[in-house]
Amino acid sequence: HFHNHRFDYLWILSGDQLYNMDFSKVIGQHIKNDAEVTVATIPVDREAATGFGIMQIDADRQIREFVEKPQEPDVIDSLRIPAETRNDLGLGDDEDQYLASMGIYVFNRDVMLKYLDSEHIDFGKHIIPEAIDQCRSFSYVYQGYWEDVGTIRTFFESNLDAASELPKFNFFDMEAPIFTRPRFLPASKINGAAID
C-alpha cells in the first residue's frame, strides 16, 4: 500500500495515549539532524523504566543504546540520563531519570519501506532496535503531559484526572485546540462568572 503513495516521512503513532505534542517540532528536529529515524521519548523514573523501551543518547540526542523493558539493575543503571544531558534538557538534579520510548516514531520513507519488506513482526523488539543500530536515529525529548491509557487502570485514572477541577491535561488550551466532531467536544467551561 505504501509503495503507491509519495511521501518523505512516515509517522507511527500509538492510539492509546493522551498527550498534546507539537509535531512540527519533532519533524523539524528530524530534518535538522538529517535523521533516518526519530523516536519521541519522555523522562521516567527508575520504577517506570522497566515497563518501557529505554534509550541512552549522546549530547546531540543521537540514540546510542536501546533496551526494551530492561529488568537487570546493572543494565538499568547504565541507561540513566547523564548529568550533562539532564542539565541540557532542564530536567533538574534527580539522578534516577531515564528516557522512555513513547511509541511515537518518524521514519524516512526508504527506511520504513525497507523494514516493511523484512521478516520482522514486532516493532519494539525487532524493528526499533535494528533501526537504531543501522540508521541515523535520534531522540526527540518531550517534556509535556503524556499518559499511556492502554490499560483499564491507566484509562480510568486519566478519566478521573480529566474530571478534576484542574486536570493535568488541558482540554481548553487556546494555543493547542482539539479538533473533532461537534458531538465529541469537551463540556462547557465558564471562568470568572457569578451565578445568582
Predicted regions and their residues:
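Gly/Ser/Thr-rich beta-alpha loop segments that engage phosphate groups in nucleotides
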Residues: 17, 105, 152
